[in-house]
Amino acid sequence: MKQSLTLVFLVAIGYATAYTTSHDYSGGYGGGCYGSDCDSGYGDSGYGGGCTGGDCGGGYGGGYGGGCSGGDCGNYGGGYGGDCNGGDCGNYGGGYGGGNGGGCSGGNCGGGFDEAFPAPYGGDYGNGGNGFGKGGSKGNNYGKGYGGGSGKGKGGGKGGKGGKGGTYKPSHYGGGY
């Protein structure tokens, strides 16, 4: 019995190690991620670095303080304080990311929608809050509401023009949409 438990334990450790390795938490909590695919959980540049490449998606990619540049910066890409530049800066990327500190430039800097974070602060809220540029082209149907209104209240400057609204895109962890 003891041998069986030991074997199960070792297999579990091996699986956990393989899973973590395969998901490549590159950059961790402070580094940068550069390449065609930086996708992985808390990796991608973590909480302080920048993410540059074709796909910087996955979890908190782009981090809470860095910039996100590339084709797809995924969930939380762009972070809470950095810039988001590229074709798709994903959920919250360019939202709070383009909002409380940085800018959002690209084809889609709109915010996503997450049940845990029901207020969909997209590029509209972000750029409005900082008083420069118009809101992102897609605010997931909430652009007009949060663009100018929240911008004037929080940014000090002139609120950005609200986005025209867009299609609802649910949040998902592990990559951009």
Swiss-Prot record:
Q: Where are the bilayer-spanning segments?
A: none
Q: Where is this region: Disordered?
A: 149-177
> Which named protein is this?
Eggshell protein
Q: Which UniProt keywords apply?
A: Repeat, Signal
Renumbered residue ranges of the record's region 5 X approximate tandem repeats: 25-112
Check the UniProt entry and state the signal peptide residues, or none. Answer: 1-18
Cite the repeat ranges for sequence.
25-41, 42-59, 60-75, 76-91, 92-112
Q: Where is the composition biased (Gly residues)?
A: 149-166
